[in-house]
Amino acid sequence: MNQNRSLFAKLADGSLVLQIILGIIAGVALASFSPSSAESVAFLGDLFVGALKAIAPILVFILVAASIANQKKNTKTNMRPIIVLYLFGTFAAAITAVTMSFLFPTSLVLVSGAQGATPPEGIGEVLNTLLFKVVDNPVNALMTGNYIGILAWGVGLGIALHHASENTKTVFADVSHGVSQMVRFVIRLAPIGIFGLVANTFAATGFEAIAGYAQLLAVLLGSMLIIALIINPLIVWFKIRRNPYPLVFTCLRESGVTAFFTRSSAANIPVNMALCEKLDLHEDTFSVSIPLGATINMAGAAITITVLTLAAVHTEGIQVDILTAILLSVVAAVSACGASGVAGGSLLLIPLACSLFGISNDVAMQVVAVGFIIGVIQDSAETALNSSTDVLFTAAACEAAERQAEI
């Protein structure tokens, strides 16, 4: 019995990143030697992602309400600089994707269109959807994972309870800590969940289906790597005025790896919040900025929209001037910020961007279908970039504010 306890204690206290790496290796090995067995453990990944998605909405709601209710007077949350970083980072990603697409023009072998997919008719529809998400029924927002609505109601309840008795505030703070403990338990299950996700992905898909789109993937992933390893560190250095790479690699390692395999910014919210606590960031700040980032900080989505749209443009033989390319960057950045308001995310915003160049909806939907084919890598990398950047920019803004306060 004591031996079993010591084994569990070692697992609980061991390096989570190392355990995740072992889970990845085990998943690849199982898929290589026994694909049928690999598919049978897919439920482990589904359970892990399901648990994260289940706990994330209530975590966000309780944390936001508790942090605002317990916020002391004259406490700065640094939200304005974080939002500026989110928006600037998304626009920089779109510009980078345009540059890469011009340097390495890609043509597509188009397939049949994505079935059952309904793209938004324009940017107005995307923004309209986001606006109505704010006034969603709070119970429905929690049930459906509508983080815009959850944030709005959490902020509203927090403000309403700001003048409540200390006992009431203490109850909310205690519930917040309790939910956080549940999140830590779920996150410790990440190695098992990622083992199931990796095994199933390799067994069901492999790399045969995406081998024909190697150049497109190279442009997509190259753009994302440039943002993650060059542009984002430059932005962070500008804010904190020191070597940004230790922080960058911490965020990529502890947030990006999990996000890559869960392929869900919402599911990665608890992971990001735990990382923010580990980095000793201000809870009043990250309890709002992390779920907000999961909604509007979409550098990866901006890259996907831009690269696939320009691939369609090159396929159709359309000439693009600089002004149109800049306009595409703006549209891609704004659309990406609304990607959470569209079923299907960034891929279904491609027809909207394609309409700038007069590309028919039929062709645009074929490009969307290509996106679904390469989605196993594209969506994973996009989510990893989006989610890890949420923590990175939050940490940069908090550190910059602390440095200014000391001056």
UniProtKB/Swiss-Prot annotation:
<feature type="transmembrane region" description="Helical">
    <location>
        <begin position="216"/>
        <end position="236"/>
    </location>
</feature>
<dbReference type="GO" id="GO:0032329">
    <property type="term" value="P:serine transport"/>
</dbReference>
<keyword id="KW-1133">Transmembrane helix</keyword>
<dbReference type="InterPro" id="IPR023025">
    <property type="entry name" value="Ser_Thr_transp_SstT"/>
</dbReference>
<protein>
    <recommendedName>
        <fullName>Serine/threonine transporter SstT</fullName>
    </recommendedName>
</protein>
<keyword id="KW-0813">Transport</keyword>
<dbReference type="Pfam" id="PF00375">
    <property type="entry name" value="SDF"/>
</dbReference>
<keyword id="KW-0029">Amino-acid transport</keyword>
<dbReference type="GO" id="GO:0005295">
    <property type="term" value="F:neutral L-amino acid:sodium symporter activity"/>
</dbReference>
<keyword id="KW-0812">Transmembrane</keyword>
<keyword id="KW-1003">Cell membrane</keyword>
<feature type="transmembrane region" description="Helical">
    <location>
        <begin position="357"/>
        <end position="377"/>
    </location>
</feature>
<keyword id="KW-0472">Membrane</keyword>
<comment type="function">
    <text>Involved in the import of serine and threonine into the cell, with the concomitant import of sodium (symport system).</text>
</comment>
<feature type="transmembrane region" description="Helical">
    <location>
        <begin position="82"/>
        <end position="102"/>
    </location>
</feature>
<dbReference type="GO" id="GO:0005886">
    <property type="term" value="C:plasma membrane"/>
</dbReference>
<feature type="transmembrane region" description="Helical">
    <location>
        <begin position="322"/>
        <end position="342"/>
    </location>
</feature>
<feature type="transmembrane region" description="Helical">
    <location>
        <begin position="48"/>
        <end position="68"/>
    </location>
</feature>
<keyword id="KW-0769">Symport</keyword>
<feature type="transmembrane region" description="Helical">
    <location>
        <begin position="290"/>
        <end position="310"/>
    </location>
</feature>
<feature type="transmembrane region" description="Helical">
    <location>
        <begin position="192"/>
        <end position="212"/>
    </location>
</feature>
<dbReference type="InterPro" id="IPR036458">
    <property type="entry name" value="Na:dicarbo_symporter_sf"/>
</dbReference>
<dbReference type="InterPro" id="IPR001991">
    <property type="entry name" value="Na-dicarboxylate_symporter"/>
</dbReference>
<feature type="transmembrane region" description="Helical">
    <location>
        <begin position="141"/>
        <end position="161"/>
    </location>
</feature>
<dbReference type="GO" id="GO:0015826">
    <property type="term" value="P:threonine transport"/>
</dbReference>
<keyword id="KW-0997">Cell inner membrane</keyword>
<feature type="transmembrane region" description="Helical">
    <location>
        <begin position="14"/>
        <end position="34"/>
    </location>
</feature>
<comment type="similarity">
    <text>Belongs to the dicarboxylate/amino acid:cation symporter (DAACS) (TC 2.A.23) family.</text>
</comment>
